[in-house]
């Protein structure tokens, strides 16, 4: 059975970095949970993370990523690249189905199981089924308003929840400021 239902958005503006997700977990066409937490802080609260995909796979990747952060003393880029290398080459990790967004005060990165570590050109990134909708809304708000990162993230997530059936309007946020 396929699990769907995640939208994770990260916005950086001025000295604030915010990550937001919806709370819906769906199996097939059934909503199983409305308030799941798909985001967390790692490395003594200095790194934000969020996932789209299988929950068990995501937690495995969170643990691995946190280990890489410890090994590389909080160097987000190095930890992300090393995780992506492991994810791509390890026979067991290779089967994990998830995408991660990770961010610190300087960088926002998307990490995939294909070995990709992508730093968006803009200060906005999104993953998951509602990711394209949240990204478009956040980008429009970022480019055309002076709203703070948190307001942009919340408004964009609300818009995504009205378009994507796998995204709800119970929005959970974490912030670095």
Curated annotation (Swiss-Prot):
Q: According to its UniProt record, which residues of this chain constitute the active site?
A: 6
Question: What keyword terms does UniProt attach to this protein?
Answer: Allosteric enzyme, Cytoplasm, Hydrolase, Metal-binding, Protease, Sodium, Threonine protease
Looking up Gene3D superfamilies in the UniProt record yields: Glutamine Phosphoribosylpyrophosphate, subunit 1, domain 1 (3.60.20.10)
Where it sits in the cell: the answer is: Cytoplasm
Annotated InterPro entries = ATP-dep_Prtase_HsIV_su, Ntn_hydrolases_N, Proteasome_sua/b, Proteasome_suB-type
Q: What is one term from the GO cellular component aspect held by the record?
A: proteasome core complex
Per the UniProt entry, the Enzyme Commission number(s) are 3.4.25.2
Any known activators or inhibitors? Answer: Allosterically activated by HslU binding.
Q: Which GO terms describe its molecular function?
A: metal ion binding; threonine-type endopeptidase activity
EC class, as a word, reads hydrolase
Which BP terms in the Gene Ontology apply to this protein? proteolysis involved in protein catabolic process
The residues listed in the UniProt record as binding Na(+), with positions renumbered to this chain, are: 161, 164, 167
Instruction: Show the CDD domains listed in the entry.
Output: protease_HslV (cd01913)
- The superkingdom listed in its UniProt entry is Bacteria
Write down the chemical reaction(s) this protein catalyses.
ATP-dependent cleavage of peptide bonds with broad specificity
Q: What is the protein's known function?
A: Protease subunit of a proteasome-like degradation complex believed to be a general protein degrading machinery.
Please describe the quaternary structure of this protein: A double ring-shaped homohexamer of HslV is capped on each side by a ring-shaped HslU homohexamer. The assembly of the HslU/HslV complex is dependent on binding of ATP.
Family label? Belongs to the peptidase T1B family. HslV subfamily.
Q: What is this protein called?
A: ATP-dependent protease subunit HslV
């Amino acid at each position: 059975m396929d699990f769907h239902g995640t939208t994770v958005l990260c916005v950086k503006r001025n000295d604030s970095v915010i990550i937001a997700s919806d709370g819906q977990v769906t199996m097939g066409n059934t909503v199983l949970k409305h308030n799941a937490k798909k985001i967390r802080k790692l490395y003594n609260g200095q790194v934000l993370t969020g996932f789209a995909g299988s929950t068990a796979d995501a937690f495995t990747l969170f643990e691995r990523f946190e280990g890489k952060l410890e090994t590389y003393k909080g160097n987000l880029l190095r930890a992300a690249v090393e995780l992506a290398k492991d994810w791509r080459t390890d026979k067991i990790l290779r089967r994990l189905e998830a995408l991660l967004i990770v961010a610190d005060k300087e960088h926002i990165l998307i990490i995939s199981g294909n070995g990709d570590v992508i730093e968006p050109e803009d200060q906005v990134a999104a993953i998951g089924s509602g990711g394209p909708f949240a990204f478009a809304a956040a980008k429009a708000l970022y480019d055309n308003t002076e709203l703070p990162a948190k307001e942009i993230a919340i408004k964009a997530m609300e818009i995504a929840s009205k378009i994507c059936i796998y995204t709800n309007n119970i929005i959970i946020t974490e912030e670095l400021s």
